[in-house]
Amino acid sequence: HADETIEVSAIRELEEETGWTAEHAEVLLIGPTSSGSSNEKIAFVRATGLRKVGEGGGDGDEDITVHEVPRAQAAAWLTAKMSEGYELDAKLWAGLWMIEHHLDGRPRG
């Protein structure tokens, strides 16, 4: 998959891992996962035009449980999971904010 754009890769991974595909993917931000400690980078991508096409769950050696949570309930669902003792990646919160806001803080319309 070395020739793929970030957008194409994001849509492919979305489908493999969740069973959903997207008509469009927009790169919102690319940055380091751990500044100064690694050269690894993460891309935050906003997918739109979603539709269910399969079961998801990953491929081969991946063991992914898919949770389908409506966007409007995502923050409450994540908060409930934390109160149940789950440790969640902080990037989830950044991603939720970025899909609803431009980087300068303006709401997406």
Identify what each model region corresponds to.
Residues 1-12, 16, 50, 58-60, ...:
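Conserved Nudix-box catalytic region and its N-terminal flanking loop in Nudix hydrolases
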Residues 2, 35-38, 43, 60-109:
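Nudix hydrolase/Nudix homology domain
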Residues 6-8, 27-30, 45, 53, ...:
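Extended aliphatic helical segments
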Residues 11, 25-26, 75, 95:
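Generic N-terminal initiation segments characterized by hydrophobic and/or small/turn-forming residues
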Residues 15, 19-53, 80-82:
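Active-site segment of metal-dependent pyrophosphate-handling enzymes
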